[in-house]
Amino acid sequence: MFFKHDEQLEKLGNGILEGTWAKFPTLARNQIAITWIIYDPPAPVNTGGALTPDAFWNHPVRGFNYRGVERIYPASVIKLFYLLAIHEWLEKGMTQPTEELERAIRDMIIDSSNDATSLVVDVLTGTTSGPELPPGPFETWKKQRNIVNRYLQSLGWEELQTINACQKTWGDGPYGRERAFYGQLLENRNMLTTNAVARL
């Protein structure tokens, strides 16, 4: 775990949960998940690059979580993980910046555009949407589409080990090869945990 459990935050967090359940009694215990982290002074954020990544991650962080490891369908929160990946791809020269890609990245985050996210996922993975594929080409397509998952796993953060970040985001839902990739029971949908989001 990247944060240290803290008694004070535990007490406050449990109080927030109890207050929430008191106000919303029909909210089941398994319908909420929280991860809350605190960077104590001197906070290592907004340093303008003064800290190396190693120094940043060695700074102690206090935290609290309730069901922080439960996998949850993230809707548009997944776009933050695609933002991380596309910046890594650009920084490492794995893709080239273009005006359209810059516009898509901006719209993906600022407007939460699903259409923009579709282009970003295409660029990240070298795949495109379309009709169903025969088994052989579909296996290749699936392997390529999982490249963001492999990148996230390579970071070695335990909080990212159970997440799934390989699907585009949709307004009306997927069709063709995208729908087949979701799985018959939607078992391959994007999934995050609150701990993973907090770590990011």
Report the location of each language-model feature.
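Active-site-adjacent helix/loop patches that line small-molecule binding or acyl-intermediate pockets
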Residues: 4-38, 100-195
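A generic structural signal for ordered alpha-helices
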Residues: 12, 56-64, 83-86, 98, ...
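Short, conserved catalytic-motif segment at the N-terminal edge
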Residues: 30, 37-71, 87, 91
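Surface-exposed beta-strand edges and their flanking turn/coil or helix-capping segments
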Residues: 47-49, 81, 175
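Active-site SXXK
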Residues: 72-95, 108
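Buried hydrophobic packing segments
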Residues: 82-86, 120, 197-200
